[in-house]
Structures are given as C-alpha cells and as structure tokens.
Amino acid sequence: MNPLIFTMIMLTVILGTTIVMMSSHWLMIWMGFEMNMLAVIPLLMKQYNPRSMEAATKYFLTQATASMLLMLAVIINLLYSGQWTFTKLMNPTASIIMTLALGMKMGLAPFHFWVPEVTQGISLSSGLILLTWQKLAPLSVLYVISPAINLDLILLMSMMSIAIGGWGGLNQTQLRKILAYSSIAHMGWMASILVFNPTMTLLNLLLYILMTTTTFMLFMVASATTTLSLSHMWNKMPLITTSTLTIMLSLGGLPPLTGFLPKWMIIQELTKNNNITLATLMAITALLNLFFYMRLTYATSLTMFPTTNNMKMKWQFNNKKQLKCLPVLIILSTITLPLAPAITLLN
C-alpha cells in the first residue's frame, strides 16, 4: 500500500474513534462509527487476495447492520426524550437495541460470529488493529451509557461471550483464530463488570490491549500464524518463543501473570455486589480459556518433533523486524502483578 494513502487511512481511523469518544451528540457518534468503519476496510484488504476481500465484506456487513441498529435506537430515544444528548438514554427499548448494536460492533456473543472469520482472513498487523483499536469506540459509548444498560441483558451477553470464547478456541491451530476467541472472552469479562464498576472495565481494557499488542508483535517478528510455525521458532529465536508462550499463558489468566489481575479484580467486585453465582460460573468458564493456552504451550514446547536445523551458525538472514519497545511490553504483559501488587487496590 502507498505510504501516503496508508497514513491518510490511519488518520481517518483515529479521527473516527476520537469523534465517537469526544462527542456528546448521537448523530456525531454515529458519523464517527461510519468514518472508522469505512477507513478500516482498506486496511483489512491490505493483502489483496480472496480471503482478505471476504473478510472485509463480512466486516462491512456486520458493522453496517450494527450501525443501522444504533441509528434505530437513537431515533427511538429521540422520539421519547426529544433530544440528541449523548447521556440522555431513558427509553428501555432504545437501551436494549443500543446494547445489542454496540455488542455486535465489539464482537460480544451472540454476535461474535464475524470475529474469528475476519481475523483469520487478514494480515497480523490488520488483526492487531481489529482486536485492539476497534474496541475503543463501542466500549467508550457503553461506558457512558452504563447507568442505563439493562443489567440482565449485558450479564447474559458477557456470560455467553466468556463461554463461547473458551469453547471456540479449544480445537484451533490457527493463532489468529485463537486470539480472536480470546478477544471474545475478554470482551465478555469487560462487559460483565461494566454496570457495577465502569472504571474496572477501563483497567481491563488497558491490560487486554497491552497483552494482545505484545502477542501480535511477537507473531509479526517471528512470522508465525500456526502452532506448527510457532514450534519451528525454537531453533531460530528461542527467547522470542518463550516470551510468546508466557504471554499467551498470561492472556489465559494464569496466576501470577498479568492476565490474572483483571479476572481476580472482576470476580472480587462481583462478589462484593452479591453476584456470587455469576462470579463462580465465570471463574469456571475461564478455565476453558486457560486450558487451550496451556495445551498450546505444552504442544509447542514439549511434544513437537525436533527439527534438523541444529547448527550454531544458521543460514537464515537476520530478522529485520526487531522492535526496541518489545522487551518493555513483554515485561509489562507478564509480570505487572508481581512488580506492582498494589494495583489490586484500585477501584
């Protein structure tokens, strides 16, 4: 892609998200979502092939449907309240439709169907944008309207997302699909605590973006897209491979790694609000997510056949993709909790 065009598209994506996050008018919010969606589609088709075109089409159809539902909710609310103000969401019907529309944009169950398919059909760099930056706009709207959200609906969607995110990743060998299902599960964790403690949702989002960004960057450095290609990294870059597997365990929520921190805090907050049954179900379902990451780590490190390239001086060219910020990201993505245990006191 032409660097000038790429820069313009990225600026439009950032501008669209910024408009959504800073506007107090429903029409401006809808316009920001549309700008963001139309600018992201060329990024998804950066590698011009049938798979990426199919992924971009699925993404467009899903997001267009969600935008239509969003506008429907805005119009219902306008007829009920008579104003376009962002914070005035008083109609229960409008609130339910709005939650469903934003859940579809985020990839919450039962509207999760597009996330694995789209992520699998695009490049790793585009997948990074899709699973991190594209979550900011809908989550920011949910954050502001959280007092008006239907509690039963959002808890049902979050519980389904955590369960589907765990079950869906069990039989996957494609790393992008594994991260897509992990994203669905993490969105479920964020949505579950949104009504009770919106600030904790932001902390969870920050840690999720940190861990997912680091994982994608490691995959891009190693050019790994499957579990088999991940196992072949041992001879060429053992440190990168070890870091990748550790961060994936952190994404699964293995204590005492960073990924355990948001799960621990969310379960603690749900228990404080007398949602003990929900907290127990979420903790049990989270084991599915941890299981497929542990199985992936075990299979990649201990059960793969050894490769024949054991020479000290390898014929491969040096990797040019090394990034200076990677060591810091790896440390933050793995041992934030042991380094700063006082973060658990945040509310």
UniProtKB/Swiss-Prot annotation:
One protein family per Pfam: Proton_antipo_M
Keyword NAD in annotation: yes
InterPro entries recorded: Complex_I_Subunit_2 (IPR050175), NADH_DH_su2_C (IPR010933), NADH_UbQ_OxRdtase_chain2 (IPR003917), ND/Mrp_TM (IPR001750)
GO annotations of cellular component type: mitochondrial inner membrane
Catalytic activities: a ubiquinone + NADH + 5 H(+)(in) = a ubiquinol + NAD(+) + 4 H(+)(out)
A GO MF label: NADH dehydrogenase (ubiquinone) activity
Main location: mitochondrion
Parts of the chain that traverse the membrane: 3-23, 25-45, 59-79, 96-116, 122-144, 149-171, 178-198, 202-222, 247-267, 276-296, 326-346
Keywords attached to this entry: Electron transport, Membrane, Mitochondrion, Mitochondrion inner membrane, NAD, Respiratory chain, Translocase, Transmembrane, Transmembrane helix, Transport, Ubiquinone
Subcellular location, record wording: Mitochondrion inner membrane
Gene Ontology biological process terms from the UniProt entry: mitochondrial electron transport, NADH to ubiquinone; mitochondrial respiratory chain complex I assembly
Membrane-topology descriptor: Multi-pass membrane protein
Listed EC numbers: 7.1.1.2
Top EC group: translocase
Functional summary from the UniProt entry: Core subunit of the mitochondrial membrane respiratory chain NADH dehydrogenase (Complex I) which catalyzes electron transfer from NADH through the respiratory chain, using ubiquinone as an electron acceptor. Essential for the catalytic activity and assembly of complex I.
Subunit structure comment from the entry: Core subunit of respiratory chain NADH dehydrogenase (Complex I) which is composed of 45 different subunits. Interacts with TMEM242.
Family: Belongs to the complex I subunit 2 family.
Name of the protein in its database record: NADH-ubiquinone oxidoreductase chain 2
Encoding gene per record: MT-ND2
